[in-house]
């Protein structure tokens, strides 16, 4: 995210194999997601079918989202995977969230949405970011919701052995435009800065009293 721009004279800049998703539930299958009326609709386009399936999955996911009354609800996300090897793609719910935000951005037909893709119009992000999977061995420690520093455990015991914890982190790119401020801000009159922001995810950790448990910890999730 881009820090709120302010006049240069008024503001000083300060630095700052097997797999599973914890908490993920699915229901039904691709044949039942469409409902009883699918048989009478005929053959639909692949894009419309894909949109329908995603919306069904998003509706299901809303059941396990924190209450909107919780002021920290928007800080929760599912960017943790338990796997025997490095994941090859971003987490499923991350992709669904991105797609949902894209659909909510404009109230238009699917065809218009496809042609209004930012990539087609040559649009650029205000701040450049990079995303990658990192292991608990790379993170070592993290800060939990109470502000305490906890140790992130590298492996999680499962019935048939152990799986490693992987975290999908997004941060501001160390190359390119990030060092020069937010893209699109007139540097002659405004100061701006791209900075990495964090969210809470659930991970297996150990506190300073050697107590092991699932806790919400902060990881880098956006720029």
UniProtKB/Swiss-Prot annotation:
Protein name: Neurotrophic factor BDNF precursor form
The organism's taxonomic lineage, starting at the top: Eukaryota, Metazoa, Chordata, Craniata, Vertebrata
Record's subcellular location: Secreted
Family: Belongs to the NGF-beta family.
Database matches in InterPro entries: Brain-der_neurotrophic_factor (IPR020430), Cystine-knot_cytokine (IPR029034), Nerve_growth_factor-like (IPR020408), Nerve_growth_factor-rel (IPR002072), Nerve_growth_factor_CS (IPR019846)
Molecular function via GO: growth factor activity; nerve growth factor receptor binding
UniProt cross-references to SUPFAM superfamilies, sorted A to Z: Cystine-knot cytokines
Residues glycosylated per entry: 107
Residue ranges of the propeptide: 6-114
Signal peptide interval: 1-5
Purpose: Promotes the survival of neuronal populations that are all located either in the central nervous system or directly connected to it.
GO cellular component terms, A-Z: axon; dendrite; extracellular space; synaptic vesicle
Entry's Gene Ontology BP terms: cell surface receptor protein tyrosine kinase signaling pathway; modulation of chemical synaptic transmission; negative regulation of neuron apoptotic process; nerve development; nerve growth factor signaling pathway; neuron projection morphogenesis
Disulfide bonds: 127-194, 172-223
Keyword Signal carried by entry: yes
Name of the gene encoding the protein in the UniProt record: BDNF
Alphabetical keyword list: Cleavage on pair of basic residues, Disulfide bond, Glycoprotein, Growth factor, Secreted, Signal
Pfam annotation, one family: NGF
